[in-house]
Amino acid sequence: MAIVKCKPTSPGRRHVVKVVNPELHKGKPYAPLLEKSSKTGGRNNNGRITTRHIGGGHKQHYRLIDFKRNKDGIPAVVERLEYDPNRSANIALVLYKDGERRYILAPKGLKAGDQIQSGVDASIKTGNALPMRNIPVGSTVHNVEMKPGKGGQLARSAGAYVQIVARDGSYVTLRLRSGEMRKVLSDCRATLGEVGNAEHMLRVLGKAGASRWRGIRPTVRGTAMNPVDHPHGGGEGRNFGKHPVTPWGVQTKGKKTRSNKRTDQFIVRRRTKK
């Protein structure tokens, strides 16, 4: 993995910082694990914008990732590491002994030729997936399930990880990167190690067009809009004079957005403020 700063041969290249990984596969992805992915432009089935700042971008195929890691007792070998345009993490194509191939998230340190396994009997080794009741306290894991059999939901982006800090009966306590500590059933699965490609956060796109290639549209300030478009819009100066709000009038500074009270009981400690 190398961090490359481009020479200023043009204004668009002057500030570009790239993350180069020579171990990534340079050919085409494995076709049977691809699915068509169509653009929405941030619109729902009524044609209304439900997510702002989305539109355009290069065409992509969705890679079917195995988040469940439920192929127990069958060893697999890593064939290659690949780039995935749909996520910040890299992915690994693994070949199981019975001939099946699957994509998984590539943990830090995994390379072509390594062997991995899933299930209760899997060893404590980076890339292996097993229930958290079988993982030692203090271990670093990723792709963590929140419900047994549902598939990993926590710690899936580049460089992400979760630490198992305690085990109490049928629950384990996890410390998330945000500082939050929460309980999860110990039968939930997790993959050992942390997600690779942690250098992703160091990249600099260098120009607006690089964001447009990725399907990201500009973010316009509310104060730069007209009154019809945003509560902050209009006026002769830049002063708003009220508490800042979203385009729909909801407070933006410190308002709680979590509404799932049913699972509040599993949160041992709230995330820390930045």
Swiss-Prot record:
Keywords: Ribonucleoprotein, Ribosomal protein, RNA-binding, rRNA-binding. Residues 39-49 have a biased composition (Polar residues). GO terms for biological process: cytoplasmic translation. InterPro entries: NA-bd_OB-fold, Rib_uL2_dom2, Ribosomal_uL2, Ribosomal_uL2_bac/org-type, Ribosomal_uL2_C, Ribosomal_uL2_CS, Ribosomal_uL2_dom3, Ribosomal_uL2_RNA-bd_dom. One of its GO terms (cellular component) is large ribosomal subunit. GO terms for molecular function: rRNA binding; structural constituent of ribosome; transferase activity. It comes from the Bacteria. Pfam families: Ribosomal_L2, Ribosomal_L2_C. Residues 28-54, 221-274 are annotated as: Disordered. PANTHER family: LARGE RIBOSOMAL SUBUNIT PROTEIN UL2M, RIBOSOMAL PROTEIN L2. One of the primary rRNA binding proteins. Required for association of the 30S and 50S subunits to form the 70S ribosome, for tRNA binding and peptide bond formation. It has been suggested to have peptidyltransferase activity; this is somewhat controversial. Makes several contacts with the 16S rRNA in the 70S ribosome. Belongs to the universal ribosomal protein uL2 family. Part of the 50S ribosomal subunit. Forms a bridge to the 30S subunit in the 70S ribosome. This is Large ribosomal subunit protein uL2. It comes from Photorhabdus laumondii subsp. laumondii (strain DSM 15139 / CIP 105565 / TT01). The lineage of its organism: Bacteria, Pseudomonadati, Pseudomonadota, Gammaproteobacteria, Enterobacterales.
